[in-house]
């Protein structure tokens, strides 16, 4: 019932709050808070794909700017991306801006021709498979839970792949007591 939202996060999240709650005032204490991935696609790139494929749906990960969302046919989260892409009538899908999440969706929905641009989340993308393997060797009983924004080599090592909320739910319900978590800090 509040009328003012104070959003302490990156700018695209504040923009999303404005889009989802246009009747509310959204305040962003730090307008410089930004996510590099949110800008890793251009209108020209999207136009090139749209010119090349008649049957194209542009699917945008929610972690992007309002402008990029406006170029898209549908906006998804990491929790619902696979289900939404699977239900689209289009054969050709341009997934923007996160190539790693796009590759994950492509692997889960092989009936679609999922194409990506070279965008990525710097936090998730910098995780390397060898780091995960080293942690697995140190903690052999631990389950590996990663976000689908991680690169494909890291995702291949995971016991569970899911959104942040999915990882938390999985770890809470698992009989295991030790986890290697491949996502942003604070999910532990």
For each feature predicted by the language model, list its residue ranges:
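Active-site loop-to-helix "anion-binding N-cap" substructures in soluble metabolic enzymes
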Residues: 1-188
């Amino acid at each position: 019932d509040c009328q003012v939202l104070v959003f302490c996060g990156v700018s695209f999240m504040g923009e999303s709050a404005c889009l989802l709650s246009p009747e509310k005032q959204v305040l962003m204490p730090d307008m410089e808070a930004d996510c590099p991935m949110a800008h890793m696609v251009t209108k020209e790139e999207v136009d090139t794909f749209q010119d090349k494929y008649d049957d194209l749906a542009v699917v945008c990960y929610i972690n992007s700017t309002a402008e990029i969302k406006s170029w898209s046919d549908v906006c998804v989260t990491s929790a619902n991306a696979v289900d939404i892409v699977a239900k689209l009538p289009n054969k050709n899908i341009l997934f923007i801006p996160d190539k790693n999440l796009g590759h994950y969706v492509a692997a889960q929905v092989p009936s679609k021709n999922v194409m990506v641009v070279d965008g990525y989340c710097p936090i998730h993308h910098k995780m390397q498979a060898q780091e995960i393997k080293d942690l697995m060797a140190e903690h052999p009983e631990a389950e590996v839970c990663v976000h689908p924004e991680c690169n494909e080599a890291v995702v291949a090592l995971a016991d569970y792949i899911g959104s942040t909320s999915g990882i938390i739910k999985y770890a809470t319900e698992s009989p295991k007591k030790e986890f290697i978590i491949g996502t942003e800090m604070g999910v532990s």
